[in-house]
Amino acid sequence: MNWQGWAEIAFILGLTVALGWPLGLFLARLWEGEQTWLDPVLKPVERLVYRACGIDPRQSQTWSSYALALLAFSAASFILLYAILRLQGWLPLNPQGFAGLPPHLAFNTAISFVSNTNWQSYVPEATVSAFSQMAGLTSHNFLSAAAGIAVAAAVTRAFAANREEGLGNFWVDLTRVSLYLLLPLSIVIALVFVALGEPQTLSAHVTATTLEGVQQTIALFPTASQEAIKQLGTNGGGIFNANSAHPFENPNPLTNLIEIVEMNVLGFACVVAFGRLVSARRDARALITVMAIFVAVAASVIYWTETRPAPALVGAQAEASVNMEGKEVRFGAPATAIWTAATTGASDGGVNAMFDSFMPLGGGMAMFMIQLGEILPGGVGSGLYGMIVLALIAVFVAGLMVGRTPEYLGKKVEAREVKYAMLAVLILPLAILGFSAAAAVLPVALEGLANTGAHGLSEILYAYSSATGNNGSAFAGFSANTPWWNTTLGIAMLLGRFGYVIPVLAIAGSLAAKPKLTVTAGTFPTDGPLFIGLLIGVILILGGLQFFPALALGPIVEHFQVLQALAR
């Protein structure tokens, strides 16, 4: 641990926030339907999509219609992706001859990519063909990300509205975000990745002879194109089982830097766009400050813990002051720490190291970031509306303390909004703790678990936290490709995505119908340090109190076991 490591973490976080501002201003223009510099090329394509699909771009939808459109689109996406995975053996671009996925694995994988989770219970390079990767998984990396940003746009319009029922048009938002934002950025980033050494090919796997004279199969895929949207859309599912620790997905420190920035930049950009459209830029800066504080603290804790000696190495009298187990030497501890904080705070789930090999507090911090709600800065779109839900609860608490009806950005926050907000917030602990409790006692779940005790419980907790939080990363350490794990994790992903989105859209519909109030001397300020502190407190209380007993039995107990081992 040295000053260069701290400087690296600060630089990457600062660069990400800085790049979020211009992207946020561009995103605001998309949400408003304003003209952009891409219009001469993409406007005809946009009109063609509307005409082919029978979409009226002038029609605004109520919150229930918007939610139904989102659910219908997601259901159709699930059916299509499930069919591709099941029929993979009969589809083209499959030179390896991979068979179709079993029903429970296809179910889990289809839900995973439709819900923007990208949990993978399989070894990608030995299971999924190039066609399934491109037509199935990569395309849904775009669509699931665009759907999340569309919901954020609807929530933003609710705060800008004055006694209105419409939240915009889901199909228009989905189309514009995909065409004008995700696709152009992904093309540029993919070309950069190819230039930096990532493969982009449809060729079959190559057999090579190693220096030891052993035959080795080298998997080849169109990696760069999926890697670009994988990180930009906070998807996280990799072409290779090692994910971004694999040299084909993340060959050098420069690609590592780009991928970290990709993970968080659109999360910050959504908040910037929100502030511009609601005319609340100072309030947006307050939200960004909260997000950046959590990412910085998490990265610092992980960096500190992972530069401690590993007890196994100390016991073997090995000279190792840093826990480099499961980490890539080409990145080092600082880049691994900021990556881990970014990927768990952003619902991305892509990894450049193996979290199961982290020290207990390092892995516990990664898990805690997910359990806080994936709002720091969160997934594309979902981070913004998740933070708005907690901001509403924060101003409600402030209103109770001073005896006034709470307001947030000119909208009264009343019982209806608070009930919907609490319904959304409770989805996470109910699914995580409920499924984890069942998995900890049922033989059908435990039979695939390789570790027992505190670490085994941590692996179970992390799996359901990752699935419900739509993150997708894993501690691993157990066989996830079984009917129990594939089914229950799939259900957890559904609850975490759609069980949260529907109450959020209901809140948006309720707020849009209310009058826009003017700020008075009695209005609680939501752009200063007092609100920032209150919001941090609400986030910690909701995350800490709900999950602390479970964390105490998992990573915290394991930490003290490590201290005991080091003291011997």
From Swiss-Prot:
It is found in: Cell inner membrane. It holds the Pfam family KdpA. It comes from the Bacteria. GO terms for cellular component: plasma membrane. It is a multi-pass membrane protein. Keywords: Cell inner membrane, Cell membrane, Ion transport, Membrane, Potassium, Potassium transport, Transmembrane, Transmembrane helix, Transport. The chain crosses the membrane at residues 7-27, 65-85, 135-155, 177-197, 254-274, 286-306, 383-403, 422-442, 489-509, 530-550. Part of the high-affinity ATP-driven potassium transport (or Kdp) system, which catalyzes the hydrolysis of ATP coupled with the electrogenic transport of potassium into the cytoplasm. This subunit binds the periplasmic potassium ions and delivers the ions to the membrane domain of KdpB through an intramembrane tunnel. PANTHER family: POTASSIUM-TRANSPORTING ATPASE A CHAIN, POTASSIUM-TRANSPORTING ATPASE POTASSIUM-BINDING SUBUNIT. Belongs to the KdpA family. This is Potassium-transporting ATPase potassium-binding subunit.
